[in-house]
């Protein structure tokens, strides 16, 4: 039996599962477009305000700091997952795993100190920071 035929025979279950998932997604999307409401009007394009008349604009400018905090959260959260995976297998990894985890934590702390030093974690405007620095001197 050629190798490609053996590979196909080995993975036929996964192929059927994949086809089933794609078919189910297509079925649900098609059914929702058929059964869903198709009303178009002025009130459909307004933001929902819990039954009250909307006040102001729905478009708000957010500071880039919010996105920075979100990225930092995701980065440090993934790093915490790596440390959790290490803590589960700490007995099997021995001292070499412990030293590797310490190096990993040191790299994390170095990154955090760098972000702190360049001001990525400062929320105060530049003028306020300068005034506070002058007051400390």
Swiss-Prot record:
Membrane protein topology class: Multi-pass membrane protein
Catalysed conversion reaction: a quinone + NADH + 5 H(+)(in) = a quinol + NAD(+) + 4 H(+)(out)
InterPro entries for the chain: NAD(P)H_OxRDtase_bac/plastid, NADH_UbQ/plastoQ_OxRdtase_su3, NDAH_ubi_oxred_su3_sf
Record field: transmembrane: 12-32, 66-86, 95-115
A Pfam short name: Oxidored_q4
Keyword vocabulary terms for this entry: Cell inner membrane, Cell membrane, Membrane, NAD, Quinone, Translocase, Transmembrane, Transmembrane helix, Transport, Ubiquinone
Recorded family membership: Belongs to the complex I subunit 3 family.
UniProt-recorded name of the protein: NADH-quinone oxidoreductase subunit A
């Amino acid at each position: 039996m050629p190798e490609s035929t053996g590979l196909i025979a080995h993975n036929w279950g996964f192929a059927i599962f994949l086809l089933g998932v794609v078919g189910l997604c297509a079925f649900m999307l098609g059914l929702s477009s058929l059964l869903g409401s198709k009303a178009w009007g002025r009130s459909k394009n307004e933001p929902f305000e819990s039954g009250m008349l909307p006040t102001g604009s729905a478009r708000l400018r957010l500071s880039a700091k919010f996105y920075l905090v979100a990225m930092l959260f995701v980065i440090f959260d993934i790093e915490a997952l790596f440390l959790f995976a290490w803590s589960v297998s700490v007995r099997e990894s021995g001292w070499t795993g412990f030293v590797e985890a310490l190096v990993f934590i040191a790299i994390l702390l170095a990154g955090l100190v760098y972000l702190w030093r360049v001001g990525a974690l400062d929320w105060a405007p530049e003028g306020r920071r300068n005034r506070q620095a002058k007051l400390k001197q």
